[in-house]
Amino acid sequence: MMEILRGSPALSAFRINKLLARFQAARLPVHNIYAEYVHFADLNAPLNDDEHAQLERLLKYGPALASHAPQGKLLLVTPRPGTISPWSSKATDIAHNCGLQQVNRLERGVAYYIEAGTLTNEQWQQVTAELHDRMMETVFFALDDAEQLFAHHQPTPVTSVDLLGQGRQALIDANLRLGLALAEDEIDYLQDAFTKLGRNPNDIELYMFAQANSEHCRHKIFNADWVIDGEQQPKSLFKMIKNTFETTPDHVLSAYKDNAAVMEGSEVGRYFADHETGRYDFHQEPAHILMKVETHNHPTAISPWPGAATGSGGEIRDEGATGRGAKPKAGLVGFSVSNLRIPGFEQPWEEDFGKPERIVTALDIMTEGPLGGAAFNNEFGRPALNGYFRTYEEKVNSHNGEELRGYHKPIMLAGGIGNIRADHVQKGEINVGAKLVVLGGPAMNIGLGGGAASSMASGQSDADLDFASVQRDNPEMERRCQEVIDRCWQLGDANPILFIHDVGAGGLSNAMPELVSDGGRGGKFELREILSDEPGMSPLEIWCNESQERYVLAVAADQLPLFDELCKRERAPYAVIGEATEELHLSLHDRHFDNQPIDLPLDVLLGKTPKMTRDVQTLKAKGDALAREGITIADAVKRVLHLPTVAEKTFLVTIGDRSVTGMVARDQMVGPWQVPVANCAVTTASLDSYYGEAMAIGERAPVALLDFAASARLAVGEALTNIAATQIGDIKRIKLSANWMAAAGHPGEDAGLYEAVKAVGEELCPALGLTIPVGKDSMSMKTRWQEGNEEREMTSPLSLVISAFARVEDVRHTITPQLSTEDNALLLIDLGKGNNALGATALAQVYRQLGDKPADVRDVAQLKGFYDAIQALVAQRKLLAYHDRSDGGLLVTLAEMAFAGHCGIDADIATLGDDRLAALFNEELGAVIQVRAADREAVESVLAQHGLADCVHYVGQAVSGDRFVITANGQTVFSESRTTLRVWWAETTWQMQRLRDNPECADQEHQAKSNDADPGLNVKLSFDINEDVAAPYIATGARPKVAVLREQGVNSHVEMAAAFHRAGFDAIDVHMSDLLTGRTGLEDFHALVACGGFSYGDVLGAGEGWAKSILFNDRVRDEFATFFHRPQTLALGVCNGCQMMSNLRELIPGSELWPRFVRNTSDRFEARFSLVEVTQSPSLLLQGMVGSQMPIAVSHGEGRVEVRDAAHLAALESKGLVALRYVDNFGKVTETYPANPNGSPNGITAVTTESGRVTIMMPHPERVFRTVSNSWHPENWGEDGPWMRIFRNARKQLG
C-alpha cells in the first residue's frame, strides 16, 4: 500500500525566476510555477497514530518556506520507475534506523503546478522537457500514478541465441540488438568457440564477452600491431609506454597490473583506531603512494551530473581496490568541452556549429558536470585539489584539411592519490574455496553497456541504449564500503581481504571473471544471492548492470565472521555470491529457474581474441601562419583573459571541499585574497609529519592539430613545470599518469597517436628519468549528426593529459604565485629559447586561427636542468614566488601572479625579441620566478650551473599599487589597472555562477573582486598561539576519554580525533551503530564530539536524519540525555555534527534558543577559507580567545542560521549564546557573500548553551589545527595553528 505525504516547497524564489525566464526565452506562456516535494511511502503494514506522526516528523526537513494550496496543472517529476534513487535508499535507511520497519521504501518526487495560457501538446512537451532529466526521471500527471514506482515484476529467464540453427547471422542480429559493438573477427571467434562447445550461447554470455573485450576494457588499440605508411612498426603503443618503466623502475612498487599504480612514500605516523578498543593512535610505518587517473567521457556527454559523479566515484573505487585494500586521499578533476556560448556573454570566437540531439551542450556539461564530480568527492570525504578546464571548438585547417575540431564528446577526467600499507601493495593468493563477495549496494537496472557504449563514437548507438548506459551515484554508500576496507587494511596481517577489484564497466560480468582469473582460479556463482532491488530483472540485467559503489572481493572462508562483523558495524551491505574453484571455469546458477545462464571455460571469455592490426597513413598538417592585422595587444589581453581555459576557475573550485582530512597543505586558492592559481596540489603524508604528496596536471591538446608529438611533449613538460614548485628532490621521484584521448580511425589521427606515444614513451620520458606506471585511453572521441541535410562530425584533437605525482620532502616549502612587494626581481626562464611560437595558442584561438608552428620541448637537457635548478632554489629558500608559463603566455603568468599578490607589475620585455605580441603570448615552456633583489646574482648563478644561462631574462619587478605596466626600451607596450584585468579574468566565473547559483551571491562576489582596498585575510589573536594551556594537565598522565561520534556518511572523524589526541585526550571511535546495538554506551566518556560530513548524504535535512535516529530510539535517546545532563562533561558539534545537535534541543539543557541550520543562500555547497571572530559567550571551548579574528575552513551546503523570527534572533543575541561570527577582511561582521558563505543573519556561525558546556559550530577547526593545513597563514606561525587552542581548552576544562 502507498501513502502520500506532502513536503515543503522545493524551489527557492530565484530558482523559480530562472525557470520562468527559460520558459519566456522559449516563448512559452507560463506565468507562474509552484513546486513542492511529495513523499511516497510503500508500506508493508498500516502505521498506528504514533508511527504516523513519527513518519510525518521524519519527512519535515529543510528551510521553513511558506507553502500554499497549489493551483495550476500538475506535473509530477519522480525517478524513473524500475530505478531506486539515492535519496530513496538513504531515506529508507533512516526510517528503519528510527524503528519504522513497516516502511518498505520511501521515494520522493517534485510536484510542479504550472499556471499558463493555452499551450499546445507540443508546448506542454517542451515544458515537461525543461522540468526533468529524461535520463533519470519521468513525469506523471496525477499523484496516484507514483504507485508505478513500487510495482514489482516477475523475474524473467535467460534467453539464448540460436547460433547452431541460424549460424553467423544470429550473432550479427544479437550484436545490434544488445549494442555489443563486436568486431567482425570477434563474431567469427564466438561462432567458432560455441560451435566447439556444441551449444547455443545465452544472451548473458555474449554480453559478458562484449564487455570484457570492449575497447574500454581491453585497450585493443594500445595492444595492436602497427603498420604505418606500409612499414611494420617494432612496438605496440603499450610497449612504448612500458619502456618508461623498463628505463626508470626506481621507486615504483606496482605498475600496469592493478587498479592503480603504487610508488614509495615516506615513513610517517598513520593515524587510526584499534579494532578491539576503538582507541585512536599513530602507527609509524611507510605510507606508500598510489595514483590513478580515469576518464568518464561518454556518460558525461549524455547526463553530466551522474556522468561526472560516477566518474569520480569509479576512480575512488579503483584506489580503494588497489592491492589488498587502500585509502583514497585527494582528487583531481578535468574537463575539455566545446565552446560555452554563455547567453549574453558570447565571445567573438564562438560559432555555433550544431550538435547531435542526444548529447547536451558544453554549457550544460560545465554547469552540471563539475557539480556532480564535486558532490561525489564532497560526500565521500575526499578533497578535490587540482584540475584543468579547456574549451575548444573551431573549423581549422589541420592534418586532414579543413574540418570541425572540438569536444562535443567531452573529456571528463577524474584522478587522485591515496596511501597503502607496504604489506598490502601486492594482491594475495585466492585459495580454492575462498568466498567471493560483492560489497556495496544492490543491483539495479541501470548503466547497462557502459563499456561497449563508451567504445563507440557518440551518435552511432541507439538513443535508448545511451539511456541504459547512464549510471547513478550514491557516494555515501561508497563511503561505507571504504570504511569497511579501511577496517580491513588497519588489521595488518589479519586483513581478511585476499583480493579486491572495483565494479565498473560491465558490472559483475566483468569484475567477477577478472577477480578469479587474476587470482589464477575459476568461480561458481549463484545469481539469486546478488543483492537486488528489482526482482523483475533478467539474469543479464542482474549480472551485467553497472550499479555503482560496489567492489568484488575474495575472503578466506574462516575470515568471513570477522568480515561480517565489520560490515554490520559500518552498515555496508554485502553478499557472498560464490566461491573460487580449482578448475578455470565460470558457472552461474539461477536457482529461481534452476538453470545455468553461464557455463563457460574462462579462456573462451578472456582468451586470446584476435589481435588487432592498425594499418594507417601519416598526414602532415598544413597550418596557415597567424594573420596579425587588426590584432592589438590591448584587445588580445581582454580576449585571452575571457578564454575559459585561461580565465578564473573559482566556479569550479569553491563547490569542492578542499580541507577534509586535515592533511591538505596546498589547495588551488592562494594567499590572503584566495586566488585560484596554485601550480600544484600538496597533501601531508600524515597528521604528524611534514612529508607529503604532490600532484599536478599538464595538457596542451590544441597543439596536436599542428604537431602530434609536440603536443605530447608539452603535456609532460607542463606537468613538470607545475609540480616543480614544491620540494621533491630527485626527478625520478615523479611518476606520471598518461590519459590518451583520440578519434581512432579518423584520417591521420592513428599515425599521429603512434608518433605522440613514441615521443613520450621512447624518447622524452626515458631521457628525463620519468616513468609512466599508469594511464588510460579513450579512443572514440568523435560525434556525428545530421544538421539540416548535411552530415556533420566534430572530432576532438588528439588529447594527452599528463598527471604528475610525487613524494614531497617538506610540504612547508611549496612555492605559490603570490608576489611579494619587498625589494625584488622577476626572472623569466624561457625554455623556448626565444622561439616564441604562436601556433595553437590561446591568442590564436581567440582570433579564430590555428597558426602554423607551435611551441615544443626545445632542449630536453635544459628541461631537466630547469627542474633540478628550481629544486635547488626551493631547498635553499631562494624563491619568493613561482608560476609556470602556460595557456595565455607570459602576460597571463604575470597577471595571475599580480592577482595573487594584490600588487602591481613593472615589467620590461626588451630582451625577449622585437615581436612584442609573440613575446607576451607565446606558450613555450618556462616559468617566472620572483627572488629578493639581493639574491638575484646567486640565483642566476644556480640557473647557469644547470645550463640555463641563455634562458634567463630579467623582466622587471613587483611593486605595490594597482598598475600593471609592460615596457620595452622605454616605450609602453601595455598598461592597465590590475583591478581591471582581475575583473576581466573573473567575468567567465561570474557569468557561470550567475547561471548556476543564486545570481545575487554571484554579483556580490564579483563586486568584491573590484575592491583594490581589500586588505585580504588577516589575523588578530587575543592569546599566545604557542602557549599550550593543556600542558600541566597532560603532565598528570591522565587522558580523559572523548567519544568521536560518527554516523554513516560522516567523513571528518579522523582529523577530529587527532586534534583531541594532541590536546591530551584518549580519542575513541564510536559509530552510531555501536550505540544503537548497545555495544558501547556514553557513561565512560567525559567529552563527546559529533563530526562533520554527510550523514545519510544529507537526505531528510542535513544532520536531521542522524538526530531523529537518536530521538526516535528510546534507549539511545536516554543515553544522550543522561550525558548532556551530567555535570563535568563537554560536547562539541562541528558541521554535520552541529546540524545534528541543533536538532537535539529537547535533550540539551540551555539550548532552547538554538537556531536550525538550513540551505545556504547561494543554494550551493560552499568550500571557503573564511574569516571569523570569537565573540563573548559562555562557551568553555573558546575561553581566553574572545576578540580573536582568524581564518577557518568552511565546507557545507546547509549552514545558514534560521531563526523563527526577529524576537528569536534578539533573544539568542541578548543571552550571549553566539560564539563565532563571520567577518569581512576589514573585521566587520558581515552578511555579504562570500565573506559570509551561507547568508546567516548577523554572521552567526557558532552557538553555545547557557552553561557553555556544549558548543556547536559550522566551520571546521579540526581541519586547520596544524598551521600547515591552512590555505594561507602568517609566516610566523609554528606547528600549531590558533584553532588548536579550543581542543586544549577542552582538556583544561576537564582538569
Curated annotation (Swiss-Prot):
Q: Which residues cross the membrane?
A: none
Gene3D superfamilies in the record: 3.40.50.880, Phosphoribosylformylglycinamidine synthase, linker domain, PurM-like C-terminal domain, PurM-like, N-terminal domain
Instruction: Please give the Gene Ontology molecular function terms for this protein.
Output: ATP binding; ATP hydrolysis activity; metal ion binding; phosphoribosylformylglycinamidine synthase activity
Q: Which reaction does it catalyse?
A: N(2)-formyl-N(1)-(5-phospho-beta-D-ribosyl)glycinamide + L-glutamine + ATP + H2O = 2-formamido-N(1)-(5-O-phospho-beta-D-ribosyl)acetamidine + L-glutamate + ADP + phosphate + H(+)
Q: How is it modified after translation?
A: Both N-terminus methionine truncation and retention have been observed for this protein.
Where along this sequence does the record place binding of Mg(2+)? 718, 722, 884
Enzyme Commission code: 6.3.5.3
Region entry Disordered: which residue ranges?
Answer: 305-327
Residues reported in the UniProt entry to bind ATP: 307-318, 678, 886
pH dependence statement? Optimum pH is 7.2 with only 50% of this activity retains at pH 6.2 or 8.0.
The record's Pfam families line, in alphabetical order, gives: AIRS_C, FGAR-AT_linker, FGAR-AT_N, FGAR-AT_PurM_N-like, GATase_5
| Record localization | Cytoplasm
GO terms for CC?
cytoplasm; cytosol
PANTHER family noted in UniProt: PHOSPHORIBOSYLFORMYLGLYCINAMIDINE SYNTHASE
The UniProt subunit note reads as follows: Monomer.
NCBIfam families registered for this protein in UniProt:
FGAM_synt (TIGR01735), PRK05297.1 (NF003672)
What job does this protein perform?
Answer: Phosphoribosylformylglycinamidine synthase involved in the purines biosynthetic pathway. Catalyzes the ATP-dependent conversion of formylglycinamide ribonucleotide (FGAR) and glutamine to yield formylglycinamidine ribonucleotide (FGAM) and glutamate.
Please identify the protein, giving its name as recorded: Phosphoribosylformylglycinamidine synthase
